[in-house]
């Protein structure tokens, strides 16, 4: 992923989504096969619909076409992050307390790098998860500096 491109796009997208009372969740710029994709994920407390995605896409496309900061031809995709939205910002982690989350760590904690459970707390430096292992429950502390990525998890 080209970090510079995502930072530039975030700077263009942030005022657009704020003006529409939406939240910028994430920006991805990836090459798949021969094509480049610029994916912008937006959300709000009530969720987002196709009209809101279209409005952000139209405004962002105009702004990016005018300034032309991206070196390759690309496909722009504006969408909701979905039910398993990534947890990236402080606010995301705070809002995830009490919900099911999936966390991948950079290095093993208690011999594991993948965890899925209910987030019991988040204090800015540590996540406390309640894991269910067969019929047992276990609390685990995960330091934020060990978190490679985190997302909400859907359970059935």
UniProtKB/Swiss-Prot annotation:
GO terms for biological process: ribosomal small subunit assembly; translation. It comes from Bacillus anthracis. Belongs to the RimP family. Keywords: Cytoplasm, Ribosome biogenesis. Required for maturation of 30S ribosomal subunits. It is found in: Cytoplasm. PANTHER family: RIBOSOME MATURATION FACTOR RIMP. It comes from the Bacteria. This is Ribosome maturation factor RimP. The gene is rimP. InterPro entries: Ribosome_maturation_RimP (IPR003728), RimP_C (IPR028998), RimP_C_sf (IPR036847), RimP_N (IPR028989), RimP_N_sf (IPR035956).
């Amino acid at each position: 992923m080209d970090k510079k491109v995502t930072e530039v796009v975030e700077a263009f997208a942030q005022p657009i989504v704020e003006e529409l009372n939406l939240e910028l969740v994430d920006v991805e710029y990836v090459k798949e096969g021969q094509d480049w994709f610029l994916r912008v994920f937006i959300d709000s407390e009530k969720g987002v619909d196709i009209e809101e995605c279209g409005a952000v896409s139209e405004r962002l496309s105009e702004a990016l076409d005018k300034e032309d900061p991206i070196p390759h031809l690309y496909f722009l995709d504006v969408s909701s992050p979905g039910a398993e939205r990534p947890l990236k910002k402080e606010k995301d982690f705070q809002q995830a307390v009490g919900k099911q989350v999936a966390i991948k760590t950079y290095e093993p904690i208690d011999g594991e790098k993948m965890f899925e459970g209910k987030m019991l707390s988040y204090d800015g430096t540590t996540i406390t998860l309640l894991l269910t292992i067969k019929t047992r429950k276990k609390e685990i502390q995960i330091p934020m500096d060990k978190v490679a990525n985190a997302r909400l998890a859907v359970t059935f």
